[in-house]
C-alpha cells in the first residue's frame, strides 16, 4: 500500500523530488512557466529544495490520509489563487513521481503498490484542483 511504499521515500524526499521535477521540466517544458528566473538544472539548489518541499507535502498527506483535503487546504489555495498553476501540471508531476519511484524502488512497486500510489496521487491532485472551481 501507499504507506508501505512511502516508508522508503522518507529520508530521500529531496533526491526523489528533485528527480521528479527535473523530469517534468525536461519532458514537459510548459511546467517551467511558473519558475521564471530559477535555475532548473539537474543539480541546482532550487530544484532540490523545491523537490523536497513537494515530496514532504506528500509525506504529510500520507500521515493525514484520512483528511487529505484538510491537510492540503492551504497548498490548494496557494496553487489555485496565488500561483495560478495549470491544474494539468499536477497530472504531469504525478506521472514523473511514479516514474522516479519505479526507478528507485522497483522491487516495492508491484502492480498493487503502483495502483495504490497512483490512487493516492490522484486524490492529492483532486484536492489541489478543488479550489479552481
UniProtKB/Swiss-Prot annotation:
One of its GO terms (molecular function) is peroxidase activity. Red blood cells. GO terms for biological process: hydrogen peroxide catabolic process. One of its GO terms (cellular component) is haptoglobin-hemoglobin complex. Involved in oxygen transport from the lung to the various peripheral tissues. This is Hemoglobin subunit alpha-2. InterPro entries: Globin, Globin-like_sf, Globin/Proto, Hemoglobin_a-typ, Hemoglobin_oxygen_transport. Residues 1-133 form the Globin domain. O2 binds at residue 50. Belongs to the globin family. Minor hemoglobin is a heterotetramer of two alpha-2 chains and two beta-2 chains. Heme b binds at residue 79. Pfam families: Globin (PF00042). Keywords: Heme, Iron, Metal-binding, Oxygen transport, Transport.
Amino acid at each position: 500500500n501507499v504507506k508501505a511504499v512511502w516508508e522508503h521515500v522518507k529520508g530521500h524526499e529531496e533526491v526523489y523530488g528533485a528527480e521528479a521535477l527535473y523530469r517534468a521540466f525536461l519532458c514537459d517544458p510548459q511546467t517551467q512557466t511558473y519558475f521564471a528566473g530559477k535555475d532548473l538544472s539537474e543539480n541546482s539548489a532550487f530544484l532540490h529544495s523545491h523537490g523536497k518541499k513537494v515530496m514532504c507535502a506528500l509525506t504529510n498527506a500520507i500521515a493525514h490520509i484520512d483528511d487529505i483535503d484538510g491537510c492540503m487546504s492551504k497548498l490548494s489555495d496557494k496553487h489555485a489563487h496565488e500561483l495560478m498553476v495549470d491544474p494539468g501540471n499536477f497530472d504531469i508531476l504525478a506521472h514523473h513521481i511514479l516514474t522516479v519511484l519505479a526507478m528507485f524502488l522497483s522491487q516495492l512497486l508491484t502492480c498493487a503498490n503502483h495502483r495504490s500510489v497512483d490512487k493516492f496521487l490522484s486524490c492529492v491532485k483532486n484536492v489541489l484542483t478543488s479550489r479552481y472551481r
